[in-house]
Amino acid sequence: MMSISPIVSLRRCDNEPSMPDEWRLYKLASRLRTFSNWPFTEDCACTPERMAEAGFVHCPTDNSPDVVKCFFCLKELEGWQPEDDPMDEHKKHSPSCLFIALKKKAEELTLSEFLKLDLEHTKIKMQKQMNLHIERFQAKANEVRGHLEKLDADETQ
């Protein structure tokens, strides 16, 4: 399986209480709604229900119709086969995900438990954003270094 970075589109239901989209994803039904065009639906291990239970949301791209991302640890996976078990794949590719380590449903968490869990989720998001900015900065620094080295080489000739 390969990791890529799609955007998740979350449809809202009229009967859901007002809350941030990210909090809505703690609910199984909200994650399940993202699988409307999932390529595996019957006679397979990776049904939409099992994918959502494992914490995944479906975020397809034109080139990758089977891309999913854990709403919590942000691990992105694609290249699913009908026999792939979503929970096993999640544990294999992101063993430290706190969502899959929960011993109860997210809806059963106390407010304190939920807020602690969401704090960890926020840290994960911030780390991912920071890593992205660092990668962009390093790429730009390498580009500038190349230009400077070329200028230096031109001057010494």
Curated annotation (Swiss-Prot):
Keywords: Cell cycle, Cell division, Centromere, Chromosome, Chromosome partition, Cytoplasm, Cytoskeleton, Metal-binding, Mitosis, Nucleus, Phosphoprotein, Ubl conjugation, Zinc. Ubiquitination is required for centrosome-targeting. BIR repeats lie at residues 31-101. The modification Phosphothreonine is found at residue 47. PROSITE patterns: BIR_REPEAT_2. Highly expressed in vascular endothelial cells of tadpoles. Component of the chromosomal passenger complex (CPC), a complex that acts as a key regulator of mitosis. The CPC complex has essential functions at the centromere in ensuring correct chromosome alignment and segregation and is required for chromatin-induced microtubule stabilization and spindle assembly. Does not appear to exhibit anti-apoptotic activity. Plays a role in increasing blood vessel size during development. The BIR2 domain is required for vascular development. This is Baculoviral IAP repeat-containing protein 5.2-A. It comes from Xenopus laevis.
